[in-house]
């Protein structure tokens, strides 16, 4: 039995080494941020909901985070901001994958920008007076992918996350389009 476990571990190491050898392209965008986003966790309201609903919430709900200080960043030559008070849940990684890929880990910055873009269908310039204009779901998914590649350098991982978004992201996109959130009301 131990040979199987060691074999799987050795296979994963060799596979990681091979992927790393070919995972050396230049990112599509230049991303910069002077600091990490300042954020606080929000509680998951499970108290008083009953046993079964509490279990369901535990299995299906993701923790939400609130930005506590305007977070400034740049993509290529544009400078943008995620305003204080914005609430997001990070990269929507299915719970069964979170042991290996945390939504608040290497996908954090791209996930934050992506969540803002999904909610408002645009990115907010640092002046807080104008936006990039309406973006498509695919455009926001590409921003997520390209920012994360620029931040963490993992092409294969970020392309896998990108294709996951292309397959399942339409649910969140449609939910936000139905809510019709206005960025001006939230700054």
Regions from the PLM with identified roles:
Residues 2-187:
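Extended terminal accessory/targeting regions
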